[in-house]
Amino acid sequence: MPHARTETSVGTYESHSTSELEDLTEPEQRELKTKLTKLEAEIVTLRHVLAAKERRCGELKRKLGLTALVGLRQNLSKSWLDVQVSNTYVKQKTSAALSTMGTLICRKLGGVKKSATFRSFEGLMGTIKSKVSGGKRAWP
Protein backbone atom coordinates (compact mmCIF):
# COMPACT_ATOMS: atom_id res chain seq x y z
CA MET A 1 0.00 0.00 0.00
CA PRO A 2 1.70 3.31 -1.04
CA HIS A 3 2.20 6.02 1.58
CA ALA A 4 2.31 9.82 1.31
CA ARG A 5 4.16 11.96 3.85
CA THR A 6 2.98 15.43 4.74
CA GLU A 7 4.90 18.00 6.75
CA THR A 8 3.03 19.77 9.53
CA SER A 9 3.70 23.34 10.66
CA VAL A 10 6.01 22.27 13.49
CA GLY A 11 8.27 20.36 11.12
CA THR A 12 7.14 16.82 11.93
CA TYR A 13 6.02 14.41 9.29
CA GLU A 14 2.90 12.33 9.40
CA SER A 15 2.42 9.28 7.29
CA HIS A 16 -0.91 8.72 5.54
CA SER A 17 -1.78 5.92 3.23
CA THR A 18 -2.75 7.03 -0.27
CA SER A 19 -6.09 5.27 0.06
CA GLU A 20 -6.78 7.35 3.20
CA LEU A 21 -6.24 10.56 1.22
CA GLU A 22 -8.37 9.24 -1.61
CA ASP A 23 -11.21 8.57 0.84
CA LEU A 24 -11.51 12.30 1.54
CA THR A 25 -13.83 14.24 -0.69
CA GLU A 26 -12.72 17.47 -2.29
CA PRO A 27 -14.73 19.64 0.17
CA GLU A 28 -13.30 17.67 3.14
CA GLN A 29 -9.75 18.23 1.88
CA ARG A 30 -10.44 21.98 1.47
CA GLU A 31 -11.93 22.14 4.96
CA LEU A 32 -8.92 20.36 6.48
CA LYS A 33 -6.51 22.64 4.59
CA THR A 34 -8.42 25.68 5.84
CA LYS A 35 -8.25 24.40 9.43
CA LEU A 36 -4.54 23.71 9.02
CA THR A 37 -3.92 27.21 7.67
CA LYS A 38 -5.85 28.78 10.57
CA LEU A 39 -3.98 26.64 13.09
CA GLU A 40 -0.61 27.60 11.59
CA ALA A 41 -1.63 31.27 11.70
CA GLU A 42 -2.56 30.90 15.39
CA ILE A 43 0.82 29.30 16.09
CA VAL A 44 2.61 32.22 14.42
CA THR A 45 0.50 34.68 16.44
CA LEU A 46 1.27 32.84 19.68
CA ARG A 47 5.00 32.93 18.87
CA HIS A 48 4.79 36.71 18.38
CA VAL A 49 2.87 37.13 21.64
CA LEU A 50 5.43 34.98 23.48
CA ALA A 51 8.33 36.99 22.05
CA ALA A 52 6.64 40.25 23.12
CA LYS A 53 6.04 38.91 26.64
CA GLU A 54 9.66 37.73 26.89
CA ARG A 55 10.85 41.22 25.87
CA ARG A 56 8.56 42.81 28.49
CA CYS A 57 9.82 40.36 31.11
CA GLY A 58 13.41 41.33 30.25
CA GLU A 59 12.57 45.03 30.55
CA LEU A 60 11.00 44.53 33.97
CA LYS A 61 13.99 42.51 35.17
CA ARG A 62 16.36 45.24 33.98
CA LYS A 63 14.31 47.88 35.82
CA LEU A 64 14.48 45.77 38.97
CA GLY A 65 18.21 45.23 38.50
CA LEU A 66 17.80 41.53 37.85
CA THR A 67 20.10 41.11 34.90
CA ALA A 68 21.41 37.78 33.71
CA LEU A 69 24.79 38.52 35.30
CA VAL A 70 23.20 39.30 38.65
CA GLY A 71 21.28 36.05 38.53
CA LEU A 72 24.39 34.15 37.52
CA ARG A 73 26.39 35.79 40.30
CA GLN A 74 23.71 34.92 42.85
CA ASN A 75 23.65 31.31 41.65
CA LEU A 76 27.44 31.08 41.85
CA SER A 77 27.48 32.64 45.32
CA LYS A 78 24.86 30.20 46.56
CA SER A 79 26.72 27.27 45.00
CA TRP A 80 30.01 28.37 46.59
CA LEU A 81 28.30 28.74 49.97
CA ASP A 82 26.85 25.24 49.59
CA VAL A 83 30.33 23.91 48.84
CA GLN A 84 31.83 25.72 51.84
CA VAL A 85 29.35 24.22 54.29
CA SER A 86 29.59 20.73 52.82
CA ASN A 87 31.20 18.10 55.05
CA THR A 88 33.83 17.23 52.45
CA TYR A 89 35.00 20.83 52.09
CA VAL A 90 35.07 21.39 55.86
CA LYS A 91 37.08 18.19 56.40
CA GLN A 92 39.50 19.15 53.64
CA LYS A 93 39.99 22.65 55.07
CA THR A 94 40.49 21.22 58.59
CA SER A 95 43.02 18.72 57.27
CA ALA A 96 44.89 21.43 55.40
CA ALA A 97 44.90 23.69 58.47
CA LEU A 98 46.25 20.91 60.71
CA SER A 99 48.91 20.05 58.15
CA THR A 100 50.00 23.68 57.92
CA MET A 101 50.06 23.97 61.71
CA GLY A 102 52.16 20.79 61.98
CA THR A 103 54.65 22.14 59.45
CA LEU A 104 54.93 25.43 61.36
CA ILE A 105 55.49 23.64 64.68
CA CYS A 106 58.26 21.50 63.12
CA ARG A 107 59.95 24.61 61.74
CA LYS A 108 59.74 26.39 65.10
CA LEU A 109 61.15 23.37 66.96
CA GLY A 110 63.95 23.16 64.41
CA GLY A 111 64.69 26.83 65.01
CA VAL A 112 64.62 26.35 68.78
CA LYS A 113 67.01 23.39 68.52
CA LYS A 114 69.50 25.55 66.64
CA SER A 115 69.23 28.47 69.06
CA ALA A 116 72.01 29.36 71.51
CA THR A 117 69.68 28.99 74.49
CA PHE A 118 68.78 25.42 73.56
CA ARG A 119 72.44 24.56 72.90
CA SER A 120 73.35 25.92 76.32
CA PHE A 121 70.49 23.97 77.93
CA GLU A 122 71.55 20.83 76.04
CA GLY A 123 75.11 21.24 77.27
CA LEU A 124 73.91 21.75 80.83
CA MET A 125 71.79 18.60 80.66
CA GLY A 126 74.77 16.67 79.31
CA THR A 127 76.93 17.86 82.21
CA ILE A 128 74.30 16.93 84.78
CA LYS A 129 73.89 13.50 83.21
CA SER A 130 77.60 12.83 83.24
CA LYS A 131 77.81 13.79 86.92
CA VAL A 132 74.84 11.58 87.79
CA SER A 133 76.09 8.61 85.79
CA GLY A 134 79.55 8.81 87.33
CA GLY A 135 81.46 10.59 84.62
CA LYS A 136 80.52 8.30 81.76
CA ARG A 137 79.15 10.07 78.71
CA ALA A 138 76.72 8.19 76.56
CA TRP A 139 77.48 10.28 73.52
CA PRO A 140 80.64 11.81 72.14
UniProtKB/Swiss-Prot annotation:
GO terms for cellular component: cytoplasm. It comes from the Eukaryota. The keyword Coiled coil applies. Residues 1-28 are annotated as: Disordered. Keywords: Coiled coil. The keyword Coiled coil applies. Residues 28-57 form a coiled coil. Disulfide bonds: none annotated. Specifically expressed in testis. Expressed at 5.6-fold higher levels in adult testis than in fetal testis. Residues 7-18 have a biased composition (Polar residues). Interacts with TPD52L2. Belongs to the TPD52 family. This is Tumor protein D55.
